[in-house]
Structure formats: C-alpha cells, structure tokens
Amino acid sequence: MREMFLGEFIKNRRMELGLTQEQLCEGICEPITISRLENGKQTPSRNRINALLQRLGLPGDRYYALLSKNEKEVAALRKEIRADEIRLRRALERDQTEIRERMMKNLEQLEAIAEADDQITQQGILRSRAFLDDQSPEEQLEMLLRAIKLTVPRFALETIDRGLYSLDETTLINGIASVYDQMGEVRVAAEIYRQLLKYVESHDRDLAELAGHFCLVAHNYAITLERGKRYEESVELAQRGWQVCVEYGHYQLLPGFLSIMAECYWILGEEARARDLYYQAYYVYKAVRDEKNAVRVQKELKDHLNLEIHV
C-alpha cells in the first residue's frame, strides 16, 4: 500500500470534491492552517484533523498522531461521556441516576481541562449539557443551535444538505431534529432528517466504515416518519437500515429498526408480520442488554397483539 503524507491525502480529497480550503476549514481552523497542513509545514490538533477528515467523508483511523497529555485526557473523557450517553438511553429508570452522576462528573472534569479555543470539545460539552441538564425542549434546541454554530457559523435548517459536516456535527443536527420531534414539530423534524440522510448518503464514500453514521440518521428518521403517519415510508427506510446493520455488522440499532417495522405493520393491519418482528426485536434487545427497550417491546406486544413473552 502506498504511503502518503497526511497533508497530501487531505489536499487530494479536497480537490476531488471541488472544495476550497476556506470551505473545508470553516469553523474548525483558519485557511492558513490548512495551507500549512497540505504543504507539510504544520499538523493541527487531533480533534481538528479528525473533523477535517470526516468533513471529507473519510474515517480518522488512517493516520497516527502523537497526543499531548491534555489531548489524551480530553479524548478519554469524551469517549467515556459518549459511552455513558448510550448506557443512559438503554438503562431502566432505576439505573439512570448513577449514570447521570458519572456523566456530570466527567463533564465537569472535561470543562476544567478543555482549552477555550477548542471549538470541537466546547461543542461536545454544550451538546451533552443540552440533554443531561434539566432543560425544556425549547432550551435544548437553543443550546444545540448554539453548539452547531460554533463550527458551522452559517448553519441554516433550509440548506442542511448543502453543508459540510464532521461526524460530531451530523450527530448534533440529528439531535436538533430529535428535539423538534419532541416539540411536536414532526414535519420540521422529518425535513431535517431527509436532508441529513441525503447528505450522509452522498458524502460518506465508504459505508462499510460509516454504517453506524447512516443507521443513526435512518433510525431516527424512520421513527419520525411513523409519528407523521407515513407508515409505508417508515417501513421502507427501516428495512434499508436493517439491511445495512446485517451487511456491515453494525448491530446497535438493529432491534430499533425491527421494532419500528413491527409497530408500522401492526398499524397497517399485518399482524403476523408485526408479531414476528416484535419477537425478533425483543430478543436482540435482550442480547445487547438494552433492558429499557426490551421492556417497551414486551409491553407493545401485549397491548397490540395480546401476546406475552415468558422469560
């Protein structure tokens, strides 16, 4: 395999996409930093390099970088906070307090060591605070919009699919759509997801490496379509998500796609299909230790089809 300097790698991909240095680096660093990187004269922080690679539709595991002690601590805390966000979504109510307290402690440590000009880390802190603190949906939305504009200053809901985003930024936009959904603005949420999915599908060149990225957006979009009573579209998208999960071995959201299809088929009157999918969703949720959603599916199966799962 041919070795290539990181700057050359980034320059080639940038030119392939027809992007200027200014377009690529907006909100992340100055154009002069990109110029120096492409000429091999400077290497920005790992946070910024990862964001640039992701905006180019490239994974960040194709290069190695020496980390300072601060960068290493920041990366470790951010990783643990993200892991706890997943644990919190899966946890039963009785287990959530411990996870929240640990997340708050890690967030406070991260805030203490994060550099003021590290927009990427500051953005992550603001996003986590929006969902962790006791905020109304309106307050959450304000915080998330403030967070996305730290690195995408010209962000606008009407032109999402024309932007250029890192994985963190697409996760943020996904969160913005989720809050609109919670507020009852289903059409707004669906339009955000539609644009975001279009962006992900057109920009992520290697689905095998970024399957989780596609599945996250597709999963939440399918839920919003169902809430908007667009059941056939929801099933179609959930089936695509299911196929991607199986084909690329990304199973975190697999039971979610199964349960979305189950409920839609039940609403559409296809009870046999719904029953089979509910059972599959339940046992996959149990296998990945997602007790919260396993209980939810168990209840839906009883409420909708008067069937019980004996464990």
How should these model regions be labeled?
Residues 47-63:
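DNA major-groove recognition helix of helix-turn-helix/homeodomain DNA-binding modules
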Residues 1-16:
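A short, Lys/Arg-rich alpha-helix, primarily the initiator
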Residues 17, 134-136, 183, 228, ...:
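Structural motif corresponding to the intra-repeat A-B loop/turn of tetratricopeptide repeats
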Residues 89-109, 134-155, 186-199, 229-239, ...:
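Helix-turn-helix repeat elements of alpha-solenoid scaffolds
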Residues 17-36:
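Short alpha-helical DNA-recognition segment
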Residues 108-121, 149-166, 199-211, 246-251:
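Flexible helix-coil transition and linker loops at the boundaries of alpha-helical arrays
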